[in-house]
Every structure is written in C-alpha cells, then in structure tokens.
Amino acid sequence: MEEDEVKIRIVSATAADAAALADLFIGHITAHPEYISHGEIQMGVGEGFVQDGRLVTRPAPGAREKWMKSILYEMSDDAVSHIWKAVDDKGTLMGFCAAYIVGDADIRFGMVGDILVNSQCRGGGVGNTLLQTAIDWFHSKGIQDIFLESGKDNHNAHRYFEKRGFVHVSEIYKLMEK
C-alpha cells in the first residue's frame, strides 16, 4: 500500500453514528440540492417548488431531525434494512450507504436508499466499496432485483450508477398544486 493511500473499512452504522451521518447528509444536500430525489421529498427531508417552469429542490425546514428519525428507524431492523459507514484507519467517517428490502413474502426487491461519500474522499473507491457491500447484503438475503433512486439533476451520480450496471427505469412526477 502506498504511503498516502487510505484504507477503507466498512462497518455497520449504529444509533451512535446517526448524528455524524445526518451532518454529512444534510451538509451535502444543502451544498448540492440536485441530490434530493422524490424519496427525500416524500419523507419531508427535502422540498420542491416550481421556478421558471422547473422543479427546484432544497432541504426542508427540520430536515436533519426528520432524516435522523428515519435513519434510526431503519437501523432498528437488520432483517429488512442495513446502514453501513465507511471509515478510514483513524475512524474518520468517509461515507455511508443505506439499503432496504421492500415487498412482501412473494415479491421482494432491494433498494439502495442513500449512498453518499464525503467530498474529500471521492474517487478513492469508497462509493464502490459501499455499493458492493450493499449488493452483497441483498444477495445474501436472496434479493436479485436491486433499485435505487437519484435526484433528477444529479447527473454525476447517474453516470456513476450506469457505469456500475444500473439502468434508467422510470420517471417520477409530483403534482404541484397551483
């Protein structure tokens, strides 16, 4: 290993990590509102409004508290959801990934709810390692169909996911009352 190469360690996130994960997440969607997808809008973490005929997104008031409540709930049932964090050899948070199993006894699929890498750690394999960890977890649970969502203008993420075998499946629309 080269002297400046950072070792990536993937570990399960716990309730004790929720505040740090929330800080990373809220900091990112504040700086990059294009990350906000319909999932964040549905859970009240993000909001959208129409400006000049286009949907504009931003973090919603109380976003951090709403996101922490959601992530703590998801951490409570490892049978259907799991959150991992990537840390370096000093324990510094590099990123995280949240994965969920959706469906019933007959039809189940995997959903990568969030995957986010600290901007200083991008390009070093953190995202790939987190994503592969989630895919392996889904496969260990017998899940083959895996989906994710991404904000409509998050083009860098779209290219990233396409390079890793994901394909564009559909569009989501929200009624914006006049």
What do these predicted ranges mean?
Residues 15, 23-107, 113, 176-177:
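Acetyl-CoA-dependent GNAT
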Residues 114-117, 123-136, 159, 163:
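Conserved acetyl-CoA-binding loop-helix of GNAT-fold acetyltransferases
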Residues 118, 151:
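Residue-level recognition of the GNAT/N-acetyltransferase active site
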Residues 128, 152-170, 175:
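Conserved active-site alpha-helix within GNAT-family acetyltransferase domains
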Residues 138-149:
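Conserved GNAT acetyl-CoA-binding A-motif
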